[in-house]
Curated annotation (Swiss-Prot):
Pathway: Alcohol metabolism; ethanol degradation; acetate from ethanol: step 2/2. Keywords: Acetylation, Cell membrane, Lipid metabolism, Lipoprotein, Membrane, Methylation, NAD, Oxidoreductase, Palmitate, Prenylation. One of its GO terms (molecular function) is long-chain fatty aldehyde dehydrogenase (NAD+) activity. It is a lipid-anchor. Dually lipidated in the C-terminus; prenylation occurs prior to, and is a prerequisite for palmitoylation. It is also required for activity towards long-chain substrates. This is Aldehyde dehydrogenase family 3 member B1. Its EC number is 1.2.1.28, 1.2.1.5, 1.2.1.7, 1.2.1.48. Belongs to the aldehyde dehydrogenase family. Oxidizes medium and long chain saturated and unsaturated fatty aldehydes generated in the plasma membrane into non-toxic fatty acids. May have a protective role against the cytotoxicity induced by lipid peroxidation. Short-chain fatty aldehydes are not good substrates. Can use both NADP(+) and NAD(+) as electron acceptor in vitro, however in vivo preference will depend on their tissue levels. Low activity towards acetaldehyde and 3,4-dihydroxyphenylacetaldehyde. Able to metabolize aromatic aldehydes such as benzaldehyde to their acid form. It catalyses: an aldehyde + NAD(+) + H2O = a carboxylate + NADH + 2 H(+); a long-chain fatty aldehyde + NAD(+) + H2O = a long-chain fatty acid + NADH + 2 H(+); a medium-chain fatty aldehyde + NAD(+) + H2O = a medium-chain fatty acid + NADH + 2 H(+); octanal + NAD(+) + H2O = octanoate + NADH + 2 H(+). It is found in: Cell membrane. It holds the Pfam family Aldedh. Disulfide bonds: none annotated.
Length: 468
């Protein structure tokens, strides 16, 4: 028996009845999300600490505050986002009404990963709600403590005839994907992304895929090594490196590597102390499977910093690898952990060639005191996002779209981009039932004169007297 059938039917009936369409309903659900975040802040922080050993600081910055900001932005702008968008007209339609209507798709499925289990649930959910959809949330079964709150507490703040949280692992997710949805939003790795896309293709369901990849970080010789080290170490080891936009490797000259390694050691010691394992600010690996995978990568190249691990705590020290070969496993897969390989190149051209012969990344970073170098990297490469002289701060701007390209994903969200993602852009033209004399120009029998007049009328963007 299909355990999802009844619930999905209930949600679809609610959507078809128009329950989610009004601005008032959407605003009420968004306010519910806001109350959920404020009422359960401590409980959420405790769950994130239990799942990932996240500090209260990292939980606030990367999970709670970002989610709250998205809710607040949607509430402030909901009515303006929902308004019909007027468009330009040609001469033939000057007296008509032409506009784009942003209508909800219908029943949306959001599949969430474990690394930012609150952020990556609520941020797309805000967009889906604001756009007027009914939603099925599938949180990750791996981040168990956060999953429990999302399943047991979040529904109390939403209209349960329009929103549902479903639980389970890969088998249940596979069963869920057999059903027809009107939109699917998936965040996770490329392998599973292909499975989700294949399932969506059976029903021709539109989809957003937020995937990952190996994000490059180029460091120019003219940089201050300590400034670069501070910034790179922070966003590499944030959440124990389990971040889809974290730098996966650094490209720099041999000279810069020799300056960067001690600077990275200084930054790591400053951030996490002489024994990072005792630091309350360093996360842990999510589970045993990923811990063992990361341990295997520690054998690549040569360990310049860190390399220690503790299986009992699923702890891996902030690690820097040097003398890494491009063919080694650490350079063939997304690391998704607190390991940073340094790869030496002779110049900027070689670095760009190295980047371009790999799959397009979700994010790309470049450090230089020369703006021309930053502009060259930006102009000669492709990635989902780009940040010069820092890391993943572009993620904090709701005015910038977030998403991948190629194997790092498709589709965009954050801020109004989330609303647009979950909205069908419906092209609308409302014409007069009268004035049939003018329309006679387009009817048979066709003449060359009528063709000339009609072509002018269809091309002109404003009124014109030159009709003949």
């Amino acid at each position: 028996m299909d355990s999802f059938e009844d619930k999905l039917q209930q949600l679809r009936e609610a959507f078809n009845a128009g329950r989610t369409r009004s601005a008032e309903f959407r605003a009420a659900q968004l306010q519910g999300l806001s109350h959920f975040l404020r009422d359960n802040k401590q409980q959420l922080q405790e769950a994130l600490a239990q799942d990932l050993h996240k500090s209260a600081f990292e939980s606030e910055v990367s999970e709670i505050a970002i989610s709250q900001a998205e809710v607040d932005l949607a509430l402030r702008n909901l009515r303006s986002w929902m308004k019909d968008e007027k468009v330009s007209k040609n001469l033939a339609t000057q007296l008509d009404s032409a506009f784009i209507r942003k209508e909800p798709f219908g029943l949306v499925l959001i599949i969430v990963p474990w690394n930012y289990p609150l952020n990556l649930t609520l941020v797309p959910l805000v967009g889906a709600i604001a756009a007027g959809n009914c939603v099925v949330l599938k949180p990750s079964e791996i981040s168990k403590a956060t999953e429990k709150i999302l399943a047991e507490v979040l529904p109390r703040y939403l209209d349960q005839s329009c929103f549902a949280v479903v639980l389970g692992g890969p088998q249940e997710t596979g069963q869920l994907l057999e059903h027809r949805f009107d939109y699917i939003f998936f965040t996770g790795n490329t392998y599973v992304g292909k499975i989700v896309m294949a399932a969506a293709a059976k029903h021709l369901t539109p989809i957003t895929l937020e995937l990952g990849g190996k994000n490059p970080c180029y460091v120019d010789d003219n940089c201050d090594p300590q400034t670069v080290a501070n910034r790179v170490a922070w966003f590499r080891y944030f959440n124990a490196g389990q971040t889809c936009v974290a730098p996966d490797y650094v490209l720099c000259s041999q000279e810069m590597q020799e300056r960067l390694v001690p600077a990275l050691q200084n930054a790591i010691t400053r951030f996490y102390g002489d024994n990072p394992q005792t630091s309350p600010n360093l996360g842990r690996i999510i589970n045993q499977k990923h811990f063992e995978r990361l341990q295997g990568l520690l054998g690549c190249g040569r360990v310049a910093i860190g390399g220690q691990s503790d299986e009992g705590e699923r702890y891996i020290a902030p690690t820097v690898l040097v003398d890494v070969q491009e063919t080694e496993p650490v350079m063939q897969e997304e690391i998704f952990g607190p390991i940073l390989p340094l790869v030496t190149v002779t110049n900027l051209d070689e670095a760009i060639e190295f980047i371009n012969r790999r799959e397009k990344p979700l994010a790309l970073y470049a450090f230089s005191k020369r703006s021309q170098v930053i502009k060259q990297v930006l102009a000669r490469t492709s990635s989902g996002g780009f940040c010069g002289n820092d890391g993943f701060m572009h993620m904090t701007l709701s005015s910038l779209p977030f998403g991948g390209v190629g194997t790092s994903g498709m589709g965009r969200y954050h801020g109004k981009f989330s609303f647009d993602t979950f909205s069908n852009q419906r092209a609308c033209l409302l014409r007069s039932p009268g004035m049939e004399k003018i329309n006679d120009l387009r009817y048979p029998p066709y003449t060359s004169r009528n063709l000339r007049v009609l072509l002018v009328a269809m091309e002109k963007r404003c009124c014109s007297c030159t009709l003949l």
